[in-house]
Amino acid sequence: MSCPVIELTQQLIRRPSLSPDDAGCQALMIERLRKIGFTIEHMDFGDTQNFWAWRGRGETLAFAGHTDVVPAGDVDRWINPPFEPTIRDGMLFGRGAADMKGSLAAMVVAAERFVAQHPHHRGRLAFLITSDEEASAKNGTVKVVEALMARHERLDYCLVGEPSSTEIVGDVVKNGRRGSLTCNLTIHGVQGHVAYPHLADNPVHRAAPFLNELVAIEWDRGNDFFPATSMQVANIQAGTGSNNVIPGELFVQFNFRFSTELTDEMIKERVHALLEKHQLRYTVDWWLSGQPFLTARGKLVDAVVNAIEHYNEIKPQLLTTGGTSDGRFIARMGAQVVELGPVNATIHKINECVNAADLQLLARMYQRIMEQLVA
């Protein structure tokens, strides 16, 4: 027996939408949404396709997601070509099956069923879809949110379809995310011959005490919703490759995943103070890719928990762990934001797959959430 959620997921997977190329995925979704009365607004920026769609008016529940996927990697290692979806032993294989074309299909089918049963729903149902989440994310959701905020668009609740689950659908719901701050630091010295260190100034030696103290800092202890802030050195480079040249510069890149116990400015101030303490000559460039956000228990979280308990008979964990998502941009609108999607065990991997039955279940959960908030 055919299943509309599985069929739409397969159609989306067949479109090789490597970020930021949408490859026709959004046109497929838009066609379905138009048929059930959605107004569509294309909001493209640069090489990125985005759309904002809505039906009804009043209190607004938006479903957000991305059509782009990461590269497939070595296609010879896939059990089936990555953009030719196949079902084996109940598992749907294909790039994007879990992240996140399965969620997109579940959203659309849930909306179709919801509108059929509630043609005169009281609230507004919306979609915010982008083709640039996996890559730079510079022309995607962030730009759409800026445009919506500029015209004072209303957004009360947003469900992001990121693959939040770990073992079964709904066992984990993300009701927040940590902030992400990257420091690109260059320590300046004086290049010279290793046999004449008095004529040079080795930036590696200079930086070592600073780095040793930096990695030992306890930034905070987290709180009831967030783990402790973490700092990790990601890249470090110095030298010419020769064994007889003292380097003139040391480059080090480190990233903070920070909780609501800190702000990005607090982190910057402490790092700069440490640099001054060690009397280093330096240049620094900071990149804030997202502030931490948290959606406490309320109408959206309660509706999501209710849907999971109703269909899967489990009580989900509310977590803020993991990387960043487009939820960090949407939260700026003052909306309650949560993430609920399929199991994430194979995302970005060879042979990415999702349990086909999970997608059908997810569509029912999404529909129940719609019914609780905007029916």
Curated annotation (Swiss-Prot):
What is written in the cofactor note of this entry?
Answer: Binds 2 Zn(2+) or Co(2+) ions per subunit.
Q: What organism does this protein naturally occur in?
A: Salmonella agona (strain SL483)
Record-linked PANTHER family: ACETYLORNITHINE DEACETYLASE, N-ACETYL-L-CITRULLINE DEACETYLASE
Protein name as annotated: Succinyl-diaminopimelate desuccinylase
> EC no.?
3.5.1.18
InterPro entries per record: ArgE/DapE_CS, Bact_exopeptidase_dim_dom, DapE_proteobac, Peptidase_M20, Peptidase_M20_dimer, Peptidase_M20A
* Its biological purpose: Catalyzes the hydrolysis of N-succinyl-L,L-diaminopimelic acid (SDAP), forming succinate and LL-2,6-diaminopimelate (DAP), an intermediate involved in the bacterial biosynthesis of lysine and meso-diaminopimelic acid, an essential component of bacterial cell walls.
Active-site residues, as the UniProt record annotates them: D68, E133 (proton acceptor)
Question: What keyword terms does UniProt attach to this protein?
Answer: Amino-acid biosynthesis, Cobalt, Diaminopimelate biosynthesis, Hydrolase, Lysine biosynthesis, Metal-binding, Zinc
Gene Ontology annotations of biological process type: diaminopimelate biosynthetic process; L-arginine biosynthetic process; lysine biosynthetic process via diaminopimelate
Show the Pfam families listed in the entry.
M20_dimer (PF07687), Peptidase_M20 (PF01546)
Listed binding positions for Zn(2+) 1 are: H66, D99, E162
How does this protein assemble?
Homodimer.
Recorded catalytic reaction(s): these are: N-succinyl-(2S,6S)-2,6-diaminopimelate + H2O = (2S,6S)-2,6-diaminopimelate + succinate
The metabolic or biological pathway listed in the UniProt record of this protein is: Amino-acid biosynthesis; L-lysine biosynthesis via DAP pathway; LL-2,6-diaminopimelate from (S)-tetrahydrodipicolinate (succinylase route): step 3/3
The GO molecular function terms of this record are:
acetylornithine deacetylase activity; cobalt ion binding; succinyl-diaminopimelate desuccinylase activity; zinc ion binding
Binding annotation for Zn(2+) 2? D99, E134, H348
